[in-house]
């Protein structure tokens, strides 16, 4: 027999999922338009994301100067690298692919974790994450990136992103790094006894909650584009 409290909890979870889906679709649509059509809008969005992440980091770590300084290093760098890459018109599609990888790993890791349950990945840092979620998210990100690359006229000049085998491998690596980045930020949130960094994005929490994966993935993505 389900208690009234459990019913309320289930109803709240259901409402949260709907909010997450609606706000997620809106956010993804905005970024797709910005990346593919309006370069200036992408710059503005990334700057706003960076400022939002810095603001939430400040609220989370204040008054610790050492941790504040960490935020001033780990947040502006990936934001700047993505903006720098987007300045080159030929990088437009590969940046779109990068965000598709991040969105798919986040989505399918959550679906895989909720569906298959299994052993906890890092129970002390992020209790809801599981190894099955990690594997599901990683493989799905690789498959999604390959499917996106099959879209007619979706031609990427970079060899390692245009080759389907290399693309799958790179996507899986970026997916693993994305989840490591998520755990990295979760460590700081647990340290300061914070569940969500904010509430500005309905169903997702704060800007830092939504975009934490770029912190470690953007530098790797940048190096792949520039040096390989």
Swiss-Prot record:
Any one GO MF annotation of this record: phosphatidate cytidylyltransferase activity
Biological processes per GO annotation: CDP-diacylglycerol biosynthetic process
Matching Pfam families: CTP_transf_1
Annotated compartments: Cell membrane
InterPro entries, per the entry: PC_trans
The reaction(s) this protein catalyses: a 1,2-diacyl-sn-glycero-3-phosphate + CTP + H(+) = a CDP-1,2-diacyl-sn-glycerol + diphosphate
Spans through the membrane: 31-51, 65-85, 93-113, 131-151, 165-185, 206-226
Pathway annotation: Phospholipid metabolism; CDP-diacylglycerol biosynthesis; CDP-diacylglycerol from sn-glycerol 3-phosphate: step 3/3
Broad enzyme group: transferase
Chief location category: membrane
Keywords assigned by UniProt, alphabetized: Cell membrane, Lipid biosynthesis, Lipid metabolism, Membrane, Nucleotidyltransferase, Phospholipid biosynthesis, Phospholipid metabolism, Transferase, Transmembrane, Transmembrane helix
Membrane topology qualifier: Multi-pass membrane protein
One GO term describing the cellular component: plasma membrane
EC number: 2.7.7.41
Protein family membership: Belongs to the CDS family.
Record protein name field: Phosphatidate cytidylyltransferase
Underlying gene: cdsA
